[in-house]
């Protein structure tokens, strides 16, 4: 029986009714650039292995479009044959869960077989794993497209990230790490209902609840199996930023900002591109306080005309296809870095008012 798996496809339009064509810090060298490689007489930048590809069909296509032009190939892995993005790649491998013994050894085996030059993690837990094992792969000539391990850990811990923002004078929604600290902060007028309650190390919108009274807040905090944080409810507009931090210069080389119109399952389903120099500068400053590298997804709120940084996911965001179709092509920036070249800064180099609307599509095949 042929399985059917859904993935997200993207439609762009110039308006909701009409479709269209498509400060200072030291530079951080995440890896040492090396000369371009030659295989079979052709010069190429890399073969890339994308880990835990899941439903990121579009992303796999974007990398194929980029690296086929450079005589490269895109190989992917997942632990399930029901991951539709497997069937978009030049080659795919079913692997054990990343938490099982021997996972890294299996990835190394695939890298040797496919002559892989770079690894790209997409899943939260895999960011930690690859960041911590970067040197292991670099010693084999394989580069992990991932941020510094400490910065990955900080961004994944939402309370630590809030404290980092606070210590660096970056506006953020006030956050507490316990019911007791919430009660103290509320008495001091720093926070009040409604609030968001969310897992400290959650992803997407999983486990997030709006809470309007202390009774419910106490129940959630007392009986949750996960460590929770309590954050001031942001009653305003929500924005997402797709950022590329150059892996050679350590600076933000590209920023694309979209206003989120509608969310589904923690990902942006409908959005419109926007530009704001004040927001670009806030993003630059925030990035400069961390050792980030490669594709970054940032969430921002605007309340009463003021911007507040909500969180950073140091990976490709689910809404990245909007940026790609607006001409912000991170795979090309990755390829440039992997060939040993730093990218020039091009902030806001896209059309404003370009809308994205996702819809469901399917892959049907024998597995």
Task: List PLM regions with ranges.
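ATP-binding N-terminal substructure of ATP-dependent carboxylate-amine bond-forming enzymes
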Residues: 23, 41-145
């Amino acid at each position: 029986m042929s399985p059917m798996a859904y993935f997200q496809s993207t439609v762009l339009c110039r308006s909701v009714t009409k479709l269209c064509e498509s400060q200072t810090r030291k530079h951080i060298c995440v890896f040492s650039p090396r000369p371009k490689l030659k295989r079979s007489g052709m010069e190429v930048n890399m073969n890339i292995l994308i880990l835990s590809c899941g439903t990121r069909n579009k992303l796999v296509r974007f990398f194929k479009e980029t690296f086929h032009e450079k005589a490269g190939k895109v190989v992917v892995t997942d632990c399930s044959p029901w991951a539709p993005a497997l069937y978009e790649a030049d080659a795919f491998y079913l692997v054990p869960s990343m938490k099982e013994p021997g996972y890294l050894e299996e990835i190394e085996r695939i890298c040797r077989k496919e002559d892989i030059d770079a690894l790209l993690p997409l899943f939260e837990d895999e960011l930690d794993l690859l960041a911590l094992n970067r040197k292991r792969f670099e010693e084999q000539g394989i580069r992990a497209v991932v941020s510094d391990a400490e910065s990955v850990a900080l961004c994944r811990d939402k309370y630590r990230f809030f404290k980092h923002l606070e210590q660096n004078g970056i506006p953020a929604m006030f956050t507490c790490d316990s019911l007791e600290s919430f009660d103290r902060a509320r008495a001091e007028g720093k926070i009040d209902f409604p609030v968001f309650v969310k897992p400290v190390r959650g992803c997407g919108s999983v486990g997030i609840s709006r809470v309007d009274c202390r009774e419910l807040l106490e129940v959630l905090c007392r009986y949750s199996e996960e460590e929770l944080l309590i954050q001031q409810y942001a009653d305003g507009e929500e924005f997402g930023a797709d950022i590329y931090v150059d892996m050679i210069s350590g600076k933000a080389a590209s920023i694309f900002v979209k206003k989120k119109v509608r969310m589904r399952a923690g990902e942006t389903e409908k959005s419109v591109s926007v530009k704001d120099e004040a927001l670009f500068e806030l993003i630059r400053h925030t990035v400069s306080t961390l050792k980030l590298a490669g594709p970054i997804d940032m969430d921002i709120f605007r309340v009463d005309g003021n911007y507040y940084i909500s969180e950073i996911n140091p990976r490709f965001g689910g809404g990245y296809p909007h940026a790609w179709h607006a001409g912000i092509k991170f795979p090309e920036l990755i390829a440039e870095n992997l060939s040993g070249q730093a990218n020039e800064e091009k902030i806001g180099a896209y059309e404003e008012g370009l809308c994205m609307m996702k819809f469901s599509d399917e892959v049907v095949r024998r597995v």
